Amino acid sequence: MRRAALWLWLCALALRLQPALPQIVTANVPPEDQDGSGDDSDNFSGSGTGALPDMTLSRQTPSTWKDVWLLTATPTAPEPTSRDTEATLTSILPAGEKPEEGEPVAHVEAEPDFTARDKEKEATTRPRETTQLPVTQQASTAARATTAQASVTSHPHGDVQPGLHETLAPTAPGQPDHQPPSVEDGGTSVIKEVVEDETTNQLPAGEGSGEQDFTFETSGENTAVAGVEPDLRNQSPVDEGATGASQGLLDRKEVLGGVIAGGLVGLIFAVCLVAFMLYRMKKKDEGSYSLEEPKQANGGAYQKPTKQEEFYA
């Protein structure tokens, strides 16, 4: 509770601070991350008009603390023993621009030469290690500076040093809890941001207003599939003509009906032949054991019986 109350008090104090000396920073932020992505801005046409020239934006110390980028880097390296190495510097848009709701804020590491160092010590629970690198900012047009993407851009694909975690905290005018503590800059200072030099898995910066759409990584499975496909093409071709002709004949109803009818007729003929052979064999066996009188050779003509002589004793 005490920590939350302290944060609220610091945020309220930050809202009452007045801007100090303006600072000029040359903007060199990749244009693909400056796309509105759904933000309807009258000053932004959205058409691809080619590479846009670099613009120079004047940055002033915060007056409202609503249009800020907050990038918090948490290193995995051993934490330093001194807490004086951390201070917070927030960069905002020019005072004449109005913030938009839901805009993310970036928290960058800066030199510990500000008037709110003591307050930051109280609000910070653990020290952080800062790497001093000059911040480069780039805005395609002056209209883009009025949108939510005009400040420091952090790449969503992991453009942070290894071991550092990136946290984005959206802020709104009605949500002061997520706003950073107030820091009053006494003069021109160089912003220090933890940035990673490597830009792997990023599409090249496109011309116009297009934002980087997607980043695809080629996996081993896709490569394996691509290697298998040529093997399938190198196989010997099948005679599609003969196969298609045979399948076409079988698919025709009249041909299929003729084949079935011929098979049935052949089966009936074979059964009749076997039955006839069995019948002949049976009749032959019956004739060999017959007791009937043999037929006469003359065709059945009448013959006078022979007279038998009797002998008496």
From Swiss-Prot:
PROSITE patterns, sorted: SYNDECAN
GO molecular function, one term: extracellular matrix binding
Region spans: Disordered: 27-58, 95-186, 286-313
Membrane topology, record value: Single-pass type I membrane protein
GO biological process: canonical Wnt signaling pathway; cell adhesion; cell migration; cell-cell signaling; myoblast development; positive regulation of exosomal secretion; positive regulation of extracellular exosome assembly; receptor-mediated endocytosis
Protein name: Syndecan-1
Family listed: Belongs to the syndecan proteoglycan family.
Record-level GO cellular component terms: cell surface; external side of plasma membrane; extracellular region; plasma membrane; protein-containing complex
Pfam families (UniProt xref): Syndecan (PF01034)
Keywords (A to Z) from UniProt: Glycoprotein, Heparan sulfate, Membrane, Phosphoprotein, Proteoglycan, Secreted, Signal, Transmembrane, Transmembrane helix
Feature type site, description Cleavage of ectodomain: 253-254
Annotated localization: Membrane; Secreted; Secreted, Extracellular exosome
Composition bias, Low complexity: 135-154
Cytoplasmic side: 279-313
Main function: Cell surface proteoglycan that contains both heparan sulfate and chondroitin sulfate and that links the cytoskeleton to the interstitial matrix. Regulates exosome biogenesis in concert with SDCBP and PDCD6IP. Able to induce its own expression in dental mesenchymal cells and also in the neighboring dental epithelial cells via an MSX1-mediated pathway.
Regions crossing the membrane: 258-278
Protein source organism: Rattus norvegicus
Residues with Phosphoserine modification: 288
